[in-house]
Amino acid sequence: MARLFSLKPLVLALGLCFGTHCAAADAVAAEETDNPTAGESVRSVSEPIQPTSLSLGSTCLFCSNESGSPERTEAAVQGSGEASIPEDYTRIVADRMEGQSQVQVRAEGNVVVERNRTTLNTDWADYDQSGDTVTAGDRFALQQDGTLIRGETLTYNLEQQTGEAHNVRMEIEQGGRRLQSVSRTAEMLGEGHYKLTETQFNTCSAGDAGWYVKAASVEADREKGIGVAKHAAFVFGGVPIFYTPWADFPLDGNRKSGLLVPSLSAGSDGVSLSVPYYFNLAPNLDATFAPSVIGERGAVFDGQVRYLRPDYAGQSDLTWLPHDKKSGRNNRYQAKWQHRHDISDTLQAGVDFNQVSDSGYYRDFYGNKEIAGNVNLNRRVWLDYGGRAAGGSLNAGLSVLKYQTLANQSGYKDKPYALMPRLSVEWRKNTGRAQIGVSAQFTRFSHDSRQDGSRLVVYPDIKWDFSNSWGYVRPKLGLHATYYSLNRFGSQEARRVSRTLPIVNIDSGATFERNTRMFGGEVLQTLEPRLFYNYIPAKSQNDLPNFDSSESSFGYGQLFRENLYYGNDRINTANSLSAAVQSRILDGATGEERFRAGIGQKFYFKDDAVMLDGSVGKKPRNRSDWVAFASGSIGSRFILDSSIHYNQNDKRAENYAVGASYRPAQGKVLNARYKYGRNEKIYLKSDGSYFYDKLSQLDLSAQWPLTRNLSAVVRYNYGFEAKKPIEVLAGAEYKSSCGCWGAGVYAQRYVTGENTYKNAVFFSLQLKDLSSVGRNPADRMDVAVPGYITAHSLSAGRNKRP
C-alpha cells in the first residue's frame, strides 16, 4: 500500500518510489500487503460501483415493491481510515503508485484521494501536483459535504473544486431535501456549483424514476440554493407531460421567485386553470400573482402580498373578475387585509378588513362552509393594552367595527349594529384570598335602519377563592350597571334609560381520585362534583334596546354561567342551583387526559324569566332539563364525542349528537355522527325572521386503503327532514411504494341554498420534496373526513419508520 501527503509547494512522500529508491519502496509495499493495516480496509471501487447509465431507474408508476425502498444499491464512499491530515494537505492511498516528485503521480487499485472535506474513490488516478489536479477513471465516486458524484471519468482541481466528469450520477442532500440526477457531463464550477448537460433529475429514492425532469442543461448552486433548468420537460411514468424553455427551482426548500405549479379543477362553472407566479421580494416580503381562467365565467386575477417584521406582520389578498360571463356582472372582487402591529410590550394594534363586490360572491365561488361563515364580513381596527396599574393588572381595548352584510338568496339581510367605537377596560387586583375588580365598556352603536345610541356598562365585583388540593369554594358579589343614551329615530324619541342589578353566586367543587386499570393500562380516574348557586333579581328590560344580545343554547357549560344571554343588553333573572358531576380519565404515566364525561341539571327557586324582548314572564318549573356529555378516546383506536339535552318534563330529547371514530392506524379512518335538534334555527326568511324546524342529519365519512397503494375517501352527509343529501364526496388516492409521488381525484356535490347545488371535480399530484399539482386535498378533507391524512404524507411517514 502506497501513500502520498502533499502541501503545495512542499511535497513530503512516504513509501512512494522515486528513481533509485524504487526497490526499497517495493519491499515496503510487499510487506504491507502481507500484513494489512487499517488503511487497507478500503474496498475496491471497481467492485461495488456499478456501471453508470443515463437512467434514474424504473419509470413504472405502479410497480410492486414490498420493501418500499429502492432495489438499486451502491457502496458508500470510503475514506483511507488513517489519521486526519492538516487543512489543504492532499493524501493519496492506493495499491500501487509511481511517478515523479512535484510533477505527477500515477495511482492504481483501490485509490483513495483525500483533501479537506473531499474524498475520491476510483480505479486509477493521475495526480498533477503542480496544478493540484486529479484525473480519474474508469469509475469514480466523489464525496464532498452533502454531494455525491459517481461517473466514468473525472478531471478535478482539488484546490479550486472545479473540473468535469462524464456519464455522471449525482446525489445532493441539503436542508432535509434529496436531489438525484444522471447527466452526460457535469461541470464543477466551484464549491457546491455544478452545470449538468443532457440530464434527468428528481427528488425520489435511488432507483425510482416514477417522475423526473429531463433538461438540456441544469445549473445548480448550493450556496444560493437555486437550480436553473433549460429546455426542460416534466416526465411522469415515462411520458412527457409539460415542457418549458426555462425553469428554476429551490435546492434547499427556501423560497424563491418563479412559476408555481398550475392548479386545475372542474365543476359547475366548467374547467378552471390557474398559473401562479411567486415573487420572493425580500426575506420578509413576498407576493403571488395568479391569473386564472374559469370556463363559464372568464378571466380571474388573484394577488397576495405578505410581509413580516419583528414588530408587525400582515397579509393582503385581492381577487378580481373584470367580467363574469355567467352572471353578467362586471368588476366582481374580493379584498382582504389582516395586519398586526406590536407597538410595545404592552400595546398592540391591528386591522381586519374584508369586502366583496356583491352578496352572491360566496354563493358563486365558494362552498357551503364559506357561505355560512361569511354573512357579516368584518371591517375592524383595534388597539389593545395589557399592563399594570394601581397594584393590579389592567387590560384595555379600543376598536371600531363595521360590517358588510350579505343578503340571502331572497334578498334579505340582517345587518348588525356597527361599533363606532367601543372602549373596554378591565382592572383586577388580588388581596389575600380575595380579588377585587371592575370592568367597564363604552360603545357607540350605529345603524342605518334602527334606533341607535350609546351604552355604558360598569361592573365592579369582588370574589374569594377558598381552595385546597381536594376542592374549592368561590363566592362572588357584583353590581352590574348599564346606561343608555338613545338617539331619535323616526317616531322614537331620544331618551336615556338605565338598569342596575346585583349579582351573587357561589361556585364550589371537589375532586376525588383513584388509581385503576382501564383501556389496557394504568390510569388515574377522578370524580368531580360541582355546585353553582346564582342569584340575579327579576327586572323588566323591555324599555331597553337590544344592540347585541342573543340567546345561547342550553348545554353543560351553561349550568355555570351567570348570564344565559350573550351581550350586555339582556340579563336573565336567576335564583337557581346547578348540580353536576364529571369524571375524567388521565393516563397514569403522562397525566394526559384521555376521556371525560359529565351530567348536570339546574334547580330553580323562582319561576320568573327574562325574555329576549326584555319582558319578564313565568316559566313554571322546579328544575331544568338534563344535559350530559362524553368525549375522548376509548382504547387506542376508538374516539367518542357525544352530548344530549333531555327534557324530562316532556320526556323527550331537545337535541343530541353522537359521534364515533375508528382509527386503527394512519390512513385508516371510519367516522359516523348523528345530530338531532327538535326546534333548530334553519335559515333567515325574507321577512327577517328565522325559520325553525326539526334538524336530523347523518354524517358518514371514511378514508380506507383498498390495496397497499390505493385508498378510498368518502363522505355522505344526509338531511332527513330535507330528504336529500347535504354533501356527497368520493375520491381515490394512490401513493407510490417508495413515497416518490402521490395522486388523488375527487368529486363533490354540496348544497349552496334551499334548492341549489354545486358540483366540483378536482385532482392533486404531490411530488416528494418538490411541489404539488392541483388543489391540496387536505384543505377540504380535514373538515369532511376528521382524521384524514394525505396519501403522500402517509407514504412519507411510512418510509421514515425503521
Curated annotation (Swiss-Prot):
Pfam families linked: LptD
Localisation: Cell outer membrane
GO cellular component, one term: cell outer membrane
Keyword Ribonucleoprotein: no
Signal peptide coordinates: 1-25
UniProt-listed GO biological process terms: Gram-negative-bacterium-type cell outer membrane assembly; lipopolysaccharide transport
Main location: membrane
Keyword terms of this UniProt record: Cell outer membrane, Membrane, Signal
rRNA-binding keyword on record: no
Subunit relationships: Component of the lipopolysaccharide transport and assembly complex. Interacts with LptE and LptA.
Protein family: Belongs to the LptD family.
Task of the protein: Together with LptE, is involved in the assembly of lipopolysaccharide (LPS) at the surface of the outer membrane.
More about this protein: Present in outer membrane vesicle formulations which are used as vaccines in human.
Protein name per UniProt: LPS-assembly protein LptD
